[in-house]
Amino acid sequence: MRNGIKLTEQEATLRQLLLDVSSYSVTLGGHHQKPELRFAGGWVRDKLLGLLSNDIDVAISSMTGSEFGSLMKQYVELPEARDKYENDILGRLAKIEANPEKSKHLETATLKVLGFDIDLVNLRKETYTDVSRNPSVEFGTPEEDALRRDSTINALFYNLQTSEVEDFTGRGFQDLQRKVIKTPLAPLQTFKDDPLRVLRSIRFASRLMYEIAPEDEMAMRDSTIKAALRLKITRERVRVEILKMLGWPKPHQSPSLLEASGPHRALSLIDRLDLYNEVFTDPTDADCKLVDTTKWHRAYNQLRDMVKSGSEGPIRSILLGSPEGPEALYHAWLLTCFVPWAREPLMFPQKSSKRPMTAASLAAREGIKAENKIYRLIDDAVSHLQDIIEKKNAISHEDQTTKLTIKRKQGASAVLHREMLGLAIRKWGANWRSSVMYALLTEVAETKTETDAQVVLDGYSSWLLHLSSLNLLDVDQLEPIVKGDTLMKAFNTKGGKWVSLALNCMIEWQLRNPDRTDAAGAIAEVVRRKEELNIPP
């Protein structure tokens, strides 16, 4: 493993370019010592494990990342560099200023080179004190830089000058072989310095299917570390770690997501280490209650089992095999995170006059600073939870008591039944499949035995098959058979509130008459209800 890194052609070109820039820096006279360059952290780890990685951190010995990035831009404009390398080899250079607020202490430059996403950063030493929550940061040695990293397997360097892998912690190779996540220094102090390292350890343990060292787990359970994780770290940083655990930003390219192993392991570790109420919570509310997570494992275990079963039943094919593809599974794991909040009462945001929010929505907004798309996904799921369960149970109850399948309903009863279900799904919106998955996982979490859980699964399977038989799976996308401007011409009147009411009337007619495609029939229905719809003369 120590000699296991073989560069690809593009990686070798990148290495040579960086070395050329390092040599070029000496010719300018501003730097007396040629910078030593190292690939650091995750890229080295992944290369040793035989994994592909396009993200490369470049650690620089004697100048900041932004300084080295500027030199790169100067160098590639030189005639000899243009002859040696492709035109436009560098992408846009972005400088990230040093920011010591809330445990984020990096000054880097980011750019894209040869298809790689490059972060340029100086080797550094961080010194923490009890007086300040933020460390003093200064240039450091490779050893000091390695020791301040979150884990030994992420503290390995690939020296560009010697083409050798360096293990300054003395344990990186060993822990990589033993499949152990371990902090380079004492875990309690390491996590106290930057509590986000707790979540990073969980993320790498779940992604690589490694074990967390027992002494590290013990430190993660420490009350001071849990309090620091809740209050010291910006929730945006928490969000990034949680979403990465679940397959973000490219769920379609995440094998651990598709296999269910990674996300399941991450949630089970958060659960076992008793960190749920430090992560999925509103840290701005000092009086925020601790939500009960004793049944949460049933939800994330059930989702794992559904993904790994290989069975293409209606739950998997309809809810996880939706047009969203892998993103549907990513959303399912996200929603699973908030199952413990499902039955909690509405809550009022702190320092806000806004309407009350579902507890899960508030935990998502404040706990992981969920972006609007994710916030709406969670809010929809919780808001429609009871309605979904009632609609599903109504059909299951009728099947059991009458011994008749709904499909055999006749006449007006069948027509109204399809309309009722279709309107319900349209009310649940474009995320209705995810909302149904949330309801399913919530009900499974509330069961006491495997037999009870199977009854829940059978009920959802039958209901989803029924929706499919009624051709309602895409009803949320159903458009009125007649457009609004056509309606106004038909009634020779101006638009107004009546138009939207009339279009809804048409949707209802279409749900009752799925085999009819003639606009005349739909318009006739609007004419019949003209007075009810307040259509002006």
Question: Where are the regions that the model predicts?
Answer:
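Catalytic cores of the polymerase beta-like nucleotidyltransferase superfamily
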Residues: 1-537
